[in-house]
Amino acid sequence: MALCQVRFFSQSLGKASEMVVVLPDSGEGPFPVLYLLHGLSDDASIWLRRSRIEWYVRDLPLMVVMPDGGRGWYTNAVNGDACEDHIMKDVMGQTERLFPAARDRQHRAIAGLSMGGYGAMSLALHHPESFVAAASLSGAVAVGHKPITDEMPPDFKRIFGENPQGSDKDLFALIKKVDRSQLPKLWLDCGVDDFLIEDNRAFHAHLESLGIPHVYHEFPGAHTWDYWDEHIQQVLQFVMEAMG
């Protein structure tokens, strides 16, 4: 297994960025790819530092790409960085240029925790032609479904606008617009003691009301790395089964 740290210039952000890539030990590729997103205030290295993701994929024919998403929520800000374009154009472009990565939908998936859970769902719903599966662990899935208040961090208004409900940043609205035949396979999980549990329950209920197939789990636990380290293993199984 190889571990690569890649520094590159992101045309979408207009600045340097980085990603960490885990490559399988054997085979020549092209390899299926999981794009794995971090949470708010973390970076490209956090999954390696706080979980055993490298160990969990040791026997899988799977590349794992962990990009730096900053605090940008993996969306193109109303007034600011084009973080969606950064992932879809720069990160994916560099991955496919530098590594033997699969380039077809059937062998690409995306997942993330917290902010990254929102990002995984948002990117998969904006680009269903690019991902066969998307998974959210403890995702902030309702962040675009509510008014942005003064109690929230100041960059939220810059990213989402003052009232993003109903916009393309609202997952509840966005999923209604996606062609059902093009929807990726969806996974949502959250700890029962997580402060985001009610948002996840609401999104799950919304998907059920629309008749949209998805996997939903509530597990013991909170918004912690112990929780994510345990349940990323199930997400990996879900992703591999979706890829076939």
What are these regions (language model features)?
Residues 1-244:
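Non-catalytic cap/lid and distal C-terminal segments of serine-dependent acyl enzymes
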